[in-house]
Amino acid sequence: MQNSIIGFLKPRLVEIEQITATHTKVTLEPLERGFGHTLGNALRRILLSSMPGYAVTEVEIDGVLHEYSTKEGVQEDILEILLNLKELAVKVHGKDEVFMSLNKSGIGSVTASDIIHDGDVEIIKPDHLICHLTDENASIQMRIKVQRGRGYIPASSRIHMEDDLRPIGCLLVDACYSPINRISYNVEAARVEQRTDLDKLIIEMKTNGTIDPEEAIRRAATILSEQLEAFVDLRDVKEPEIKEEKPEFEPILLRPVDDLELTVRSANCLKAESIHYIGDLVQRTEVELLKTPNLGKKSLTEIKDILAARNLSLGMKLEKWPPSSILEE
């Protein structure tokens, strides 16, 4: 080893010890004295907070309108079922969002192996319990949405953000995207030739089985390196302006008129005039609607009130309507 007053040793990945399928020890050495704790603490925080993963974010259960209800023939209440789905370990290849379904009937346990999914989805623990059916005539059907993300996003922070697009009966789930369940590190003494004042860093992690430990360490180190690049060059570098692409139309305008929950009479009158989307409706004026057969002032008032509740009105001008997505349908 070449002795140098200012030179630094570069650590190497010495050993990956697979204790169980989800429990791993990773050893790196040699590190300069003190660097074991410096790097160990930084990597630990990044591994806990910044590893991307997949989590269940929304669930629709037939016959269930809210999470505080129960379902006949099911032992668990809806909140407990959502908690069980929250802990479901899912790995998806090549997609940021997927939908899965479940349809089970008869007495017995409902597990992750009962979930129907496509070939891009991998469920790590097929025996993961979801609920119990306690009656021969009992059944449960659900639609499960899985998304990619990082960190922890509680359902409460997404309620208002997704209200306009979320159908009735869609239950939000606290999204725990991190594939790292637990992580700790330990620093031991290491030796290289005559030097005995070096550090050995041992990182012990427990995952949900969706990430390779070596890949996790590599990602965490890359994130740390990218964050430290700003300190390498402290000159004032002007950040490039990022232009946010706004959607061509507000999402609510692309929703069908049926979502307004109008009376049957009003809804049928609009469909007869080929008014299928809310964007079609808001462009009509009061005079135009009153010319619609069988649509009177009472129906017009109903339509205006419902639009006003959504910050919309009749007589709006929408350029480039209808969008290409509707024309393709």
Swiss-Prot record:
Entry GO terms, CC: cytoplasm; DNA-directed RNA polymerase complex
Domain notes from UniProt: The N-terminal domain is essential for RNAP assembly and basal transcription, whereas the C-terminal domain is involved in interaction with transcriptional regulators and with upstream promoter elements.
Family statement: Belongs to the RNA polymerase alpha chain family.
Record's keyword terms, sorted: DNA-directed RNA polymerase, Nucleotidyltransferase, Transcription, Transferase
Region of interest (Alpha C-terminal domain (alpha-CTD)), residue spans: 249-329
SMART domains xrefs: RPOLD (SM00662)
Lineage: Bacteria, Pseudomonadati, Pseudomonadota, Gammaproteobacteria, Enterobacterales
Catalysis: reaction(s): RNA(n) + a ribonucleoside 5'-triphosphate = RNA(n+1) + diphosphate
Function: DNA-dependent RNA polymerase catalyzes the transcription of DNA into RNA using the four ribonucleoside triphosphates as substrates.
GO terms assigned for molecular function: DNA binding; DNA-directed RNA polymerase activity; protein dimerization activity
Pfam family, one: RNA_pol_A_CTD
Protein origin, superkingdom: Bacteria
Region Alpha N-terminal domain (alpha-NTD), annotated ranges: 1-235
Protein name, entry field: DNA-directed RNA polymerase subunit alpha
Known EC number: 2.7.7.6
Subunit structure: Homodimer. The RNAP catalytic core consists of 2 alpha, 1 beta, 1 beta' and 1 omega subunit. When a sigma factor is associated with the core the holoenzyme is formed, which can initiate transcription.
Single Gene Ontology BP annotation: DNA-templated transcription
